[in-house]
């Protein structure tokens, strides 16, 4: 049986920290679905279609990654995609408390859905899409934190 995992997030935009997690997940699972949440309540900078396109290009070198947008409840999305593993990145203790709540709710909604927590490599442990966007808005250099295509798209958005 194929191990299908979902790595969900808003990915507004996808960072090298996200790529670190998804790359490592591809070594653990047969198929990884990078599930980009519509998240209209977060008021993303990039549209869902833009985020999907940016992530597709950034992960094109990974043969077992599928990038899709979604707006459904995560448990329902996982069931529809026949995935029973949910990948989540943990940067700090504060992340764990929130992620634990999500994991328990997802397990309540879909008992066979296991949450797997991955810590990013040390190099990426402090970055988030929000932080990268904030630094970029103030003309800080965020080149190191983003795939090239994403960096260019962010610079274009901020013009």
UniProtKB/Swiss-Prot annotation:
Site residues by UniProt (Transition state stabilizer): 18
Originating gene: coaD
HAMAP family, A to Z: PPAT_bact
GO MF term set: ATP binding; pantetheine-phosphate adenylyltransferase activity
Subunit structure: Homohexamer.
Species of the source: Salmonella paratyphi B (strain ATCC BAA-1250 / SPB7)
Record EC number: 2.7.7.3
Catalytic reactions of this protein: (R)-4'-phosphopantetheine + ATP + H(+) = 3'-dephospho-CoA + diphosphate
UniProt-annotated binding residues for ATP: 10-11, 18, 89-91, 99, 124-130
Annotated protein name in UniProt: Phosphopantetheine adenylyltransferase
GO biological process: coenzyme A biosynthetic process
GO annotation, cellular component aspect: cytoplasm
Keywords from the UniProt entry: ATP-binding, Coenzyme A biosynthesis, Cytoplasm, Magnesium, Nucleotide-binding, Nucleotidyltransferase, Transferase
Binding site for substrate: 10, 42, 74, 88
């Amino acid at each position: 049986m194929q191990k299908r995992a979902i790595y969900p997030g808003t990915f507004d935009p996808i960072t090298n920290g996200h790529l670190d997690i998804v790359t490592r997940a591809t070594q653990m699972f047969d198929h990884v679905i990078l599930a980009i949440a519509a998240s209209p309540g977060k008021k993303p900078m990039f549209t869902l279609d833009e985020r999907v396109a940016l992530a597709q290009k950034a992960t094109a070198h990974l043969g077992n990654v599928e990038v899709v947008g979604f707006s459904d409840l995560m448990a329902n999305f996982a069931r529809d995609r026949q995935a029973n593993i949910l990948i989540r990145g943990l940067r700090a203790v504060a992340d764990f408390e929130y992620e634990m709540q999500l994991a328990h709710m997802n397990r309540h909604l879909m008992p066979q859905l296991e949450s797997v927590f991955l810590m990013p490599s040390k190099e990426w442990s402090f970055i988030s899409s929000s932080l990268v966007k904030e630094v970029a808005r103030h003309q800080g250099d965020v080149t190191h934190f983003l795939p090239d295509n994403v960096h260019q798209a962010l610079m274009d958005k901020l013009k």
